[in-house]
Design a protein with these regions (language model features):
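Hydrophobic, glycine/alanine-rich multi-pass transmembrane helices and their short helix-loop junctions
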Residues: 235, 323-366, 370-373, 616-620, ...
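Hydrophobic transmembrane alpha-helices and their membrane-interface caps
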Residues: 245-293, 628-677, 718, 745-748, ...
Length: 772
């Protein structure tokens, strides 16, 4: 069958090349439909309960998609006429931000005070350059005593201040809207830094986080793919030392990548940081298929042998294992469809398409190119082959010792798996080459936190937020939160009510408390709302029928476990101290990312089990042996377990990306096992070799190819570990580690197990013979 296929392929090689090019260009034409997404929500499915809770919050109150400009005077003091004047100007200009809803700063803070029987509401700062020192001191005293400003808009020491721009994106063209806002804000910051060298401006906010996803994706495309091409060229070139083979491999890689990307465009997949790693992954998979065909071709091709015969022999040896490894690899990546995060589903589907395309090209285009391009037969046995023969002999001689050493290493490393803990801090998804990360770290250290938990706390009836009992509970909840470690700021409606109540009692400090009567509180609220200017109303804090208020808690950069523990304690407090209408979970992007790791682990567990069952069935069917198929699972499951153990020893934190590694690598590491076992069984069945000699035969025929392909895979994922996006980087590091350990297991654990298995079978046969 293979011989006939090979003969047809060799005969019609030019037609094969032509048809392949037609297919590739048809698939690649879908690239025009690809676009980058700039929305963090892409990581969450429509069914995600945390996202649904956040959407409900956003629909109840004004959306809080924001851009925060943090101004740092080099003098270390915000409270001077010059700096306050700059803040005034930035505040005014920030209103021109596309889609802006409101702008909050220390200068336009709606300061209230009593004047006779009237409530005066005005900007805290107007015309700062005209201020006398006494006026500056008054502004400083008010700002640093105001809970709604401190650790949100102004630092306690007064050394930095922020201008927060809230926007409402129409979401008609999200790909253009976010960059439009980002471009405006960055232009504004650059303009003021150039105009006033005495200040520095740092930028953060939800919109900058959204934009960072796009920047990380584009950065990976621009840097990692070229590096990977160079690595593959050098690796394959040095390993096979055949220019035409290297060129053919390179063409297969390029066609596999553009086909995968084009097919993704045809099915409507959006590019995100995880899917931006597709070219690197497809490249490593495609090169593995080609190397197996090429190395066996070169081993068979001698001056005395026909080129076509050598290629036919290589295809005969590799056709089945290359198909099986492609199938198992595709299954491993398709298991990522069980992920709770859509970008990882997209990644799995894109790489699976690339793997299948790479397989088809490696058994059509690649051998056709080998026949077309000039290839000189090797003059002598390669040093790599001689080394593998010697190494195979070493493994056979030392099989007992190697088996026990490997088993001890496995047990030792597996013991460290519990040292890992789940942690998803979304700011740390980006490394420090991304401006969003460095600016956000600076702002967290100096002013306020990017991490936030928001609550919608119901009063149980329309207008109920003026009820003193409700307000007292709300105030107690806010005070409880302010006492918790890691909390920077709590924005709560009661701060407004206490301030207005004090104003209405001649600004006497003793009256800085909640009004005693509901009617009085309602009147104060109405009076205050009527005095507020356009764009600075309370719709970001209270709902339309005044039956609920929003409380925002800003946090330091807490770990996932710390964050979930804090929210759990908050729920306990609400259930013990608050009326039932106030019971509700915290909602925010922070909470969404905090839960996603746990949700993904649970969903991927099922995907990994299904992948394992399917791959096991394929191996048993391929090897035609239930015992051999079951035995082969040991070197396939052990590497991931060892890798997570190593990760627990040296890193100790796993997150969203690492929860897909087991399913993903399962299909990859099976490749080496399938190739080794297929050659082992070929030696046993076709050549009648003993178990020890069959191991030697497997090392001599496939050992070098396994070494090169594993090296290519490891190199590919190590290149991906240079990604500026931490999810890609950590996933790549763990995957590279898993593949390295898989090679070790296939070279040092699988052969001793095979020989031990054969020895046990022989002893069993002898015992049965004696019994008869």
């Amino acid at each position: 069958m293979v011989e006939r296929y090979s003969a047809l392929l060799i005969r019609w090689r030019w037609l094969v090349v032509l048809l392949t090019l037609v297919w590739v260009f048809a698939a690649a034409s879908g690239v025009r439909f690809l676009s980058f997404t700039n929305d963090y929500r892409i990581f969450f499915s429509e069914e995600n309960p945390q996202m649904q809770a956040f959407d409900n919050l956003q629909n109840t109150y004004n959306k809080n998609d924001n851009a925060l400009l943090v101004i740092t005077p080099k003098s270390g003091n915000v409270f001077s006429p010059e700096i306050l004047n700059i803040v005034e100007q930035i505040t005014k200009d920030a209103w021109q931000t596309p889609y802006s809803l409101r702008v909050d700063s220390v200068t336009n803070f709606q300061h209230t005070y009593a004047e006779s029987d009237d409530l005066v509401v005005e900007n805290l700062v107007e015309d700062a350059l005209s201020f006398e020192p006494a006026q500056i001191e008054r502004v400083k005293a008010v700002a640093l005593a105001e809970p709604s400003l401190l650790n949100r808009i102004i630092s306690p020491s007064g050394h930095v201040t922020g201008v927060n721009v809230t926007v409402h994106l129409p979401e008609i063209d999200p790909q253009a809207e976010v960059p439009e806002v980002i471009s405006f804000i960055r232009g504004l910051a650059d303009e003021y830094e150039a105009k006033y060298p005495q200040i520095e401006i740092h930028l953060t906010g939800i919109l900058f986080m959204n934009n960072a996803f796009t920047e990380a994706s584009q950065s990976d495309f621009a840097t990692l793919v070229p590096i990977m091409f160079l690595v593959i060229l050098v690796l394959v070139g040095l390993s096979v030392r055949v220019i035409s083979g290297t060129i053919a491999t390179l063409l297969v890689i390029i066609f596999a990548i553009i086909s995968a990307m084009g097919l993704a465009g045809w099915v409507g997949i959006k590019l995100s940081p995880p899917t931006a790693s597709t070219p690197t992954m497809v490249m490593t998979m495609a090169v593995a298929h080609c190397v197996h065909v090429l190395i066996n071709f070169l081993q068979s091709y001698r001056p005395s042998q026909d080129k076509a015969q050598a290629l036919t022999e290589s295809l005969r040896i590799n056709m089945q294992p290359v198909f099986i490894t492609s199938l198992t690899t595709a299954i491993g990546f398709l298991s990522m469809n069980f992920s709770d995060a859509p970008p990882f589903r997209d990644l799995g589907n894109m790489v699976a398409m690339g793997v299948v395309t790479g397989y088809l090209l490696s058994v059509t285009l690649f051998p056709a190119l080998i026949m077309i391009l000039p290839v000189k037969p090797p003059k002598q046995t390669s040093k790599g082959l001689l080394f593998m023969q010697a190494f195979g002999n070493f493994v056979v001689v030392q099989r007992a010792r190697l088996m026990w050493v490997m088993l001890a290493a496995v047990v030792t490393l597996v013991m460290f798996i519990p040292a890992n803990e789940l942690n998803d801090e979304f700011v740390n998804y980006f490394d420090e080459t991304i401006e969003f990360r460095t600016d956000t770290d600076y702002i967290t250290d100096n002013l306020t936190g990017m991490y936030q938990i928001s609550y919608s706390l119901g009063a149980g009836e329309s207008g109920g937020i003026s009820e003193p009992v409700y307000l007292a509970t709300l105030e107690a909840f806010a005070e409880w939160y302010r006492q918790q470690p890691g909390v920077l700021h709590v924005g709560v409606f009661t701060d407004v009510m206490k301030r207005v109540n004090r104003n209405m009692h001649d600004d006497q400090p003793a009256w800085y408390r909640i009004p005693d009567l509901r009617e009085l509180a309602a009147q104060y609220l109405l009076l205050y709302e009527m005095s507020l200017p356009y764009g600075l109303d309370l719709n970001n804090q209270i709902n339309l029928d005044k039956s609920a208020t929003r409380m925002d808690v800003s946090l330091l950069s807490l770990s996932t476990n710390q964050l979930l523990a804090l929210e759990s304690r908050a729920q306990e407090w609400l259930h013990e101290n608050a009326q039932s209408s106030m019971h509700g979970s915290g909602a925010s992007p922070t909470m969404m990312f905090a839960h996603i790791g746990y949700r993904n682990v649970r969903s991927m567990l099922l995907g990994t089990v299904i992948a394992l069952v399917l791959i096991s069935m394929i191996l048993i069917f391929t090897l035609r042996s239930l015992k051999m198929g079951t035995l082969s699972l040991i070197p396939n499951l052990v590497p991931a377990a060892m890798a997570f153990g190593l990760w627990g020893m040296f890193v100790g934190q796993v997150g969203l990306a690492l929860s897909v590694v087991v399913g993903m690598t399962l299909g990859i590491v099976v490749d080496d096992t399938v190739h080794f076992l297929s050659k082992y069984q070929r030696g046993r069945r076709e050549q009648g070799l003993s178990s020890q000699d069959a191991v030697r035969y497997a090392f001599s025929t496939v050992g070098m190819a396994l070494w090169v392909t594993s090296l290519a895979l490891i190199a590919g994922f190590l290149v991906l570990s240079l990604s500026s996006f931490e999810l890609n980087s950590s996933m790549a590091q763990l995957t590279a580690t898993t593949i390295m350990l898989a090679l070790v297991a296939d070279f040092l654990l699988l052969p001793p197990l095979l020989m031990k298995f054969d020895e046990m079978n022989r002893k069993g046969d002898v015992a049965n013979a004696r019994a008869q």
